[in-house]
Amino acid sequence: MSEQQAQGAEAAVDLNNELKTRREKLAALREHGVAFPNDFRRDHTSDQLHADFDGKENEELEALNIEVCVAGRMMTRRIMGKASFVTLQDVGGRIQLYVARDDLPEGVYNEQFKKWDLGDILGARGKLFKTKTGELSIHCTELRLLTKALRPLPDKFHGLQDQEARYRQRYLDLIANDESRKTFKVRSQILAGIRQFMVGRGFMEVETPMMQVIPGGASARPFVTHHNALDLDMYLRIAPELYLKRLVVGGFERVFEINRNFRNEGISVRHNPEFTMMELYMAYADYKDLIELTESLFRTLAQDVLGTTQVPYGEETFDFGKPFEKLTMREAIKKYRPETDLADLDDFEKAKGIAQAVGIKVEKSWGLGRVVTEIFEEVAEAHLIQPTFITEYPAEVSPLARRNDENPEITDRFEFFIGGREIGNGFSELNDAEDQAQRFQDQVAAKDAGDDEAMFYDEDYVTALEHGLPPTAGLGIGIDRMVMLFTNSHTIRDVILFPAMRPVK
């Protein structure tokens, strides 16, 4: 047996012994009455106490004579004879408890408190004061065990370092890591901020089907499920777009939805098969209006959530305070591959040669528009660090977008990039039912030619368009990637509470 194996075996024995001891303590609690009481009520959280009283001196606190009730998990404990200090952690942070034997009912300190374990959940009542070092604390007059923890905190609360374990046991990660808790609080604030922003501009939040007979609204491989009652194969949605635009046809002129999408594709630092999107549709608007809305949304969220428009990310700092850069797809290719002759992008064979020169394998089903788009993604996308809008996407890769009036080979579409990543996609919507039907047919042909991500033909959606879709613009923003940027997170798993994981065998 290697030294590492021996250490692992020893750790397993230690853990089993601790689990046994904790269960014995729980059994003793059961014998003496209610083991999991539910009658303790707190009146403050730790962050409220720090916000209200950190600025006061101990003499002021003594004069105020403030009694508070708090509850949370015992993270540290220093026993010093007849008195102890405890760090209690709750949703707002941490607060220190001062626990003295003579200030508690008889027997509580020695017979109960000393037998409790780190990780146990406690309720405490007492007066606020400050220690000699100036730390806000609670001088306890009541201390109760509310929940007995049967398992120890990770590594005696030196932190949960194993990355896989952090994702699989997110509850331990949230207990052990301040940064993880902060990340998901920021995520919640971002979602609340988006809703406030959208409602303030007259948008109505709606919900559309998660299971669909025809998966539409994006080019992606769907998950397939089966509806037993209907005896029908269905798909987890890859996007809500076509249903949201049906609502615009029905007269809801400004709608948005924040919800999950599912795409049966690879997992990477940027991709999770289950992810959150915000999509909006706005009647009597075009893609330029949504460029302005997107810029305003990100600037507003940065200021409201983070308190600044200068957002650090790795070695970069994103500047949401100044106007965002705007480039056409071809301008971006030229900027980041200066030797490109833009005229060559009008000829399939020449464009194919450029694609192959930069390492792209050109598929037989691709047309010129797809080739040009692939070139852009290869040579330019990673360089789009500061907030940048890319416009003039080819019609071939934009089956739901309105064609440009001056050049029908491109569409009135943009994608929004930050940090070399696509964060949003928006366009003036195609509301010509006949054009939409033809593009669906082109997608069917591409699927028949082997493109697994090509769209299905949605006859009901075409019928809806035949009833008349007002001039409309639509936008989709990846919430997970947005949160990554705002929290300086470098993998999407760090911003999804429970990311997709392969089961442990």
Swiss-Prot record:
Gene3D superfamilies hit by this protein: Bira Bifunctional Protein, Domain 2, Nucleic acid-binding proteins
Cofactor: binding comment: Binds 3 Mg(2+) ions per subunit.
GO biological process, one term: lysyl-tRNA aminoacylation
Location(s) in or outside the cell: Cytoplasm
GO cellular component, one term: cytosol
Keyword Protein biosynthesis included in the entry's annotation: yes
Matches recorded under CDD domains: LysRS_core, LysRS_N
Enzyme Commission code: 6.1.1.6
Annotated keywords: Aminoacyl-tRNA synthetase, ATP-binding, Cytoplasm, Ligase, Magnesium, Metal-binding, Nucleotide-binding, Protein biosynthesis
Residues annotated to bind Mg(2+) 1: 415, 422
Cofactor: Mg(2+)
PANTHER family, A to Z: LYSINE--TRNA LIGASE, CHLOROPLASTIC_MITOCHONDRIAL, LYSYL-TRNA SYNTHETASE
Assembly notes: Homodimer.
Stated name of the protein: Lysine--tRNA ligase
Organism annotation: Cronobacter sakazakii (strain ATCC BAA-894)
Encoding gene (name): lysS
